[in-house]
Amino acid sequence: MRTREYLDTAAKIVTGQRQHEYGDKYQNHNNIAKLWSAYLDYNISAHDVAICMMLLKAARLKHRPTQDCYIDMAGYAAIAVSYTHLRAHET
């Protein structure tokens, strides 16, 4: 698979398949952030969730590299950067 194909696949997953399975990506990451914050007794942002999910995928790559991990990391990176874009427009 070429770089563009990986990125296209990640974009399709983030905007299509996963959104259908799990609902709106922003709401999902906000829900995860609330749960992790309550469990850890430490404030976690939705942006933090996306970064931590990339780290989870990186840990899995250490065991066995798969295309899916790289594609998922690209998807989480896109979500993470979209949070920085959203924050820029809030100020």
Label every model-predicted segment.
Residues 25-63:
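Short, contiguous, well-structured surface segments enriched in hydrophobic/aromatic residues
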Residues 16-17, 54, 82-84:
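Compositionally biased, intrinsically disordered low-complexity segments
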Residues 84-91:
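Conserved small/polar residues in nucleotide/adenosyl-binding loops
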Residues 1-40:
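Long, charged low-complexity segments
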Residues 64-83:
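Short, compact, well-ordered microdomains
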